[in-house]
Regions:
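Generic hydrophobic alpha-helical scaffold/packing signal
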Residues: 1-2, 22, 65, 69
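Catalytic cores of extracellular degradative/oxidative enzymes
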Residues: 1-9, 18
């Protein structure tokens, strides 16, 4: 939520990412697969993810990685790795095929729930940064 608000430079749009991820998943589930798979960010997938017996079947983690990377136009693999979120080789290859700039691993620290004005972005690619609040 804070990431999307920062990306859009508008704290009021922060929660919109959840709606966009939901809509993206519905399009993946309901679209004419062959006609729309590339436009939805699944160009390397021969079949719709989740088809029974499909070797490239995805789970929720894969869908989140693909959807978030596609919507933000950033390679989100470092952040997923930071959080220990496992994704398949097929999803990793699809994100690599996008050719997007890598989003460094990050964490939004906050000492108040959902209070955007107090959020501090921590770059997690440099090890363990100090907690920014007293």
């Amino acid at each position: 939520m804070h990431y999307w608000a920062d990306l859009k430079n508008d704290p009021l749009q922060g929660w919109d990412i959840w709606t966009l991820l939901y809509l993206h998943q519905r399009q993946v589930d309901k679209s004419d697969w062959d006609a729309n798979k590339a436009a939805l960010g699944y160009g390397t997938y021969a079949q719709r993810p989740g088809n029974s017996g499909d070797a490239s079947s995805t789970d929720g983690n894969d869908n989140l990685l693909l959807g978030l990377s596609w919507l933000t136009q950033r390679d989100q693999r470092p952040t997923f790795a930071l959080w220990g979120i496992r994704t398949s080789a097929a999803a990793q290859a699809q994100v690599a095929a996008y050719g997007f700039a890598e989003q460094p691993a990050f964490f939004y620290a906050n000492n108040r729930t959902n209070e955007y004005s107090t959020v501090k972005l921590l770059d997690m690619s440099q090890g363990s940064p100090a907690w920014p609040f007293p």
